[in-house]
Structures are given as C-alpha cells and as structure tokens.
Amino acid sequence: MKKAICSFIYYKLLGWKTKVSVPDYDKYIICAAPHTTNWDLFIGKLFMGAIGRETGFMMKKDWFFWPLGPIFRWMGGIPVDRSRKSSLVDQMINIAKSSKKFHLAITPEGTRKANPNWKKGFYYIAQGAGLPIILVAIDYEKKCITAEKVIHPSGDIEKDMR
C-alpha cells in the first residue's frame, strides 16, 4: 500500500523519474546530493517509498518541535545536535552494528547552500560499521533521482570518493 501511494505521488502527480541499479542491502548509508531545498526530504522519502525501500535521516534538532517533531520521527528522523559532533559518528556506528536493518540517508554538504567541501561523517559511519555507501543524485531540472553507484569504503576516502 505504501509503495503504491508513494509511486502514485512521485511518478504520476509530481512527474519524477528514477534510475536505480544498486542492490537492496540490509544495511547501507545513502549519500544524497545536492541538498538545496527543504523539499529534498519529502522528494527523497517519496522516491524511497516508490522503489520499495526504507531510510532514516538525520536532521538538525531545531526542526523537532511540535507538531513537526513527532511527524519527522515517524518518518525516520533522528534529531542531531550539531554542537556535539564528536560522538555522532560513534553513535551511528553503534546503532548500525546492533541493528538487523539500518538505512540512513545523509546529505554530505551539511547545509542547503552550495558547498563543494563535503562533510565526511557519512563515510566514517559506513567504514566503522562496515556498510556500503549508495551514491544518490537529485536532479530537480530533469526531475530524476539516480542511484547507480555503490562504494565499499576502503579507508582511503580520497580514492573512494573520486
């Protein structure tokens, strides 16, 4: 039912397309870029629902106020206190390792403004928990989300992210 509703909204009502050729793992990190609008969350959740997959997401804790907080949590949101960066990667690694399934989408820019200097937390979470990273591109002009590349972190972030 959820897949049908998400598919109808994503494909029919909004007119978006997908290009997906990556496997569906029990655990993974999604690295989604570019993150340019608050609509990314809703388009991304519809995309994941339409292709029959689930994902959680981290979001600035300031967004988790009433009435949005319970809605974001229901959607898979994890509130993040960005002033306490040191433990966030370790927390996510521990959650991933102790979970049967773990799907987390991260926007590496860390902001909705253009930022060529990506934050590397998504990579360190994946490396620490032994998870693949699925690279996802969001193209608003073509109304298409692409997921066609998987990275298995080797520990050499510069080489892996080329």
Tell where the protein language model's regions lie, with residue ranges.
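Soluble catalytic domains of membrane acyltransferases
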Residues: 3, 7, 11-12, 16-162
